[in-house]
Amino acid sequence: MADALKKGSLIRVNREAYLSSVEAKASAGDPPAYLLEGPGEVLAVKGDYAQLRFRQPVPDIWLRMDQLEAYAGS
């Protein structure tokens, strides 16, 4: 599914993939709810990574594409 993601795609972070990642191990505590609930927007893609922006007053972040899934909405 991450292969279909491109600039402008709405995403959410896959809980299992993120929690077992190096990025999660380097972060303090549990991930914030907005990260796992979405939606976030893909701003750029470089190699295996995507730059993400969430509708929160937080900095943009880079995560591996295999940790992302398309946002289905609600």
From Swiss-Prot:
Where does it reside?
Answer: Cellular thylakoid membrane
Reactions catalysed according to its record: a plastoquinone + NADH + (n+1) H(+)(in) = a plastoquinol + NAD(+) + n H(+)(out); a plastoquinone + NADPH + (n+1) H(+)(in) = a plastoquinol + NADP(+) + n H(+)(out)
Report the EC code(s) recorded for this entry. Answer: 7.1.1.-
Keywords, sorted A to Z = Membrane, NAD, NADP, Plastoquinone, Quinone, Thylakoid, Translocase, Transport
Gene Ontology cellular-component annotations: plasma membrane-derived thylakoid membrane
A Pfam family hit: NdhO
Q: What is its main location?
A: membrane
Q: How does it sit in the membrane?
A: Peripheral membrane protein
Q: EC top class, in one word?
A: translocase
Q: Which GO terms describe its molecular function?
A: oxidoreductase activity, acting on NAD(P)H, quinone or similar compound as acceptor; quinone binding
Instruction: Answer whether the UniProt record assigns the keyword Disulfide bond to this protein.
Output: no
HAMAP family per UniProt: NDH1_NDH1O (MF_01354)
* Assembly information from the UniProt record: NDH-1 can be composed of about 15 different subunits; different subcomplexes with different compositions have been identified which probably have different functions.
What family is it from? Belongs to the complex I NdhO subunit family.
Annotated function: NDH-1 shuttles electrons from an unknown electron donor, via FMN and iron-sulfur (Fe-S) centers, to quinones in the respiratory and/or the photosynthetic chain. The immediate electron acceptor for the enzyme in this species is believed to be plastoquinone. Couples the redox reaction to proton translocation, and thus conserves the redox energy in a proton gradient. Cyanobacterial NDH-1 also plays a role in inorganic carbon-concentration.
Q: What is the protein named?
A: NAD(P)H-quinone oxidoreductase subunit O
Source organism (scientific name): Synechococcus sp. (strain RCC307)
